[in-house]
Amino acid sequence: MYLDQIKTELLEAQDVLQKFIADENNIKLIQQAALLISDSFKQGGKVLSCGNGGSHCDAMHFAEELTGRYRENRPGYPAIAISDVSHLSCVSNDFGYDYVFSRYVEAVGKPGDVLFGLSTSGNSKNVLNAIQAAKQKDMKVIAMTGKDGGEMAGLADVEIRVPHFRYADRIQEIHIKVIHILMMLIEFEMAKDV
């Protein structure tokens, strides 16, 4: 009944992943992002993560595996997904949804911390505002984007971009794979100093 559609979906996902892997710069950027986060942790910093919709779920997933665990038993790492419902509803109501992440960064971000912002289009105004707030706090910024990077292109210290122009879910599939690789590399890097 749907066997052809299922196979087509899987093959398209495979194609997007193969194209991402074929660009050696993507591999280097993933390593750079993992080292940037690890260096922040080693200096007493933390990661704040944010995104909208599925990217919000990815931001929460990333923070959860830092504070909890990925594959190895180890100390928790300091990470916060900007996902507190009372904060989001307060700022949305009082200032507007464009400021839900930047207000949080302004409140708790410190020099040497890392903002991990996700936007498949690269145009999410609230993530862009968070990047600006992070820069003002002398934080490092890692952006995970898609398509042509949108307005976020060139704003981050490290931008990992999935140049897929059709559906956001394909971009998110690569984002979650990259998040899992980042977790693995961060655990490797942090274990060096134990």
UniProtKB/Swiss-Prot annotation:
Binding residues for Zn(2+) = H61, E65, Q172, H180
Binding-site positions, substrate = N52, G53, G54, E65, N93, D94, S119, T120, S121, S124, Q172
The record describes how the cofactor is bound as: Binds 1 zinc ion per subunit.
- Look up the EC number in the record and give it: 5.3.1.28
Pathway entry = Carbohydrate biosynthesis; D-glycero-D-manno-heptose 7-phosphate biosynthesis; D-glycero-alpha-D-manno-heptose 7-phosphate and D-glycero-beta-D-manno-heptose 7-phosphate from sedoheptulose 7-phosphate: step 1/1
The miscellaneous remark of the record is: The reaction produces a racemic mixture of D-glycero-alpha-D-manno-heptose 7-phosphate and D-glycero-beta-D-manno-heptose 7-phosphate.
Put simply, this protein is called Phosphoheptose isomerase
**Gene that produces this protein:** gmhA
